[in-house]
Amino acid sequence: MALPLYLVGLSHKTAPLEVRERAALDPVVALPAALSALGKGVVLSTCNRTELYGVGSPEKARAFLLSRGVAPRHLYVKEGVEALRHLYRVAAGLDSLVVGEAQILGQVREALFLARRQGATESLLEKAFQSAIALGKRARSETGIGMGAVSVAYAALDLALAVYGDLSGLSVAVLGAGEMAELFLTHLKAHGVGRILVVNRTEEKAQALAERFGGEAFGLPALPQVLRQADLVVASAAAPHYLVGPEDLPKRAKPLFLIDIALPRNIDPRVGDLPHAYLYNLDDLKRVVDRNLRARAGEIPKVEALIEKALGDYMEWYAGHRVREAIRALEAWARVQAAKAQPEAGPVELEKAAGRLAHPFILGLKRRALDRVGGPPCPEDCLLYRLSRT
């Protein structure tokens, strides 16, 4: 039988930003609803993708995403080994907007954790995601795919440097106090900046982040005041609606550059129509990313080789998984036969003898199962299973 994994999703490669916003799943309400609709599954929802992984038929997952206003042309559906290969490419950073970025690996790990918490995983999904996480670590430790600073946050900084060149005299406002904001501030601090203004719904979180980077902290009510002082705004807050609109940016003498790396977006796209405001979003970062990719392009074949090895390892595990009951029965049968042949032997000797007897049968059983992955059930497996019960 075929590997029954499936994947239904959309990403920056297939859907524009406004469509990805509709499909994004917040962890409090929408994510549990998605897992409930799937029955068993894992949901990976990031700023650049929403993907539903499960076992069996992909139709429920497809219907769920269509119900959120996603057009069929924006979706991709992969099944069997191709679904697993895609997951491995995602975890390794090959399918990211910023190839080689490390943040996606933590997001894959978090997706598995949330599915476990909902009781939505099962053995094939568990193994797939655990092996994907292990592969992602190997890709970054054994190749140069992640060399240098590679992340959406770094791409945002790269864009800021392209615009301003020197950041030392600027006031930079950061909306949000999460992982993306922290990453951006880490890169920003390394390049030197005049003034850092951190704005967050929870002022205590803004204070903690500002203290780390020598900045000033503000609650959300102070946002209009902060915008008047800023030269550059980087938005990465987790918010269900726009935090900055055209009405928040009265005409000013000097231009304001805004980079929105949040999903859903923090900044109303109409802000980009203002004569004194220059707005960039996630899709705009792709040009920056394409330039950075050239430095890591030579590492991609090395990562792809690791992926193919990991696929082989998974399919070997799956071959054993498919026939685990038969293997257990063979092992029990071998113990009985060993006891009959050596009635005077002790437990250790009997266990070794049973292992020697069962080993070639188990290898053959796994090999035949592996040969049939993607095809019909193996009649020899069924025969061996029946024989092992005698």
UniProtKB/Swiss-Prot annotation:
NADP(+) binds at residues 176-181. Pathway: Porphyrin-containing compound metabolism; protoporphyrin-IX biosynthesis; 5-aminolevulinate from L-glutamyl-tRNA(Glu): step 1/2. It comes from Thermus thermophilus (strain ATCC 27634 / DSM 579 / HB8). This is Glutamyl-tRNA reductase. The record marks 86 as: Important for activity. GO terms for biological process: protoporphyrinogen IX biosynthetic process from glutamate. Catalyzes the NADPH-dependent reduction of glutamyl-tRNA(Glu) to glutamate 1-semialdehyde (GSA). During catalysis, the active site Cys acts as a nucleophile attacking the alpha-carbonyl group of tRNA-bound glutamate with the formation of a thioester intermediate between enzyme and glutamate, and the concomitant release of tRNA(Glu). The thioester intermediate is finally reduced by direct hydride transfer from NADPH, to form the product GSA. Its EC number is 1.2.1.70.
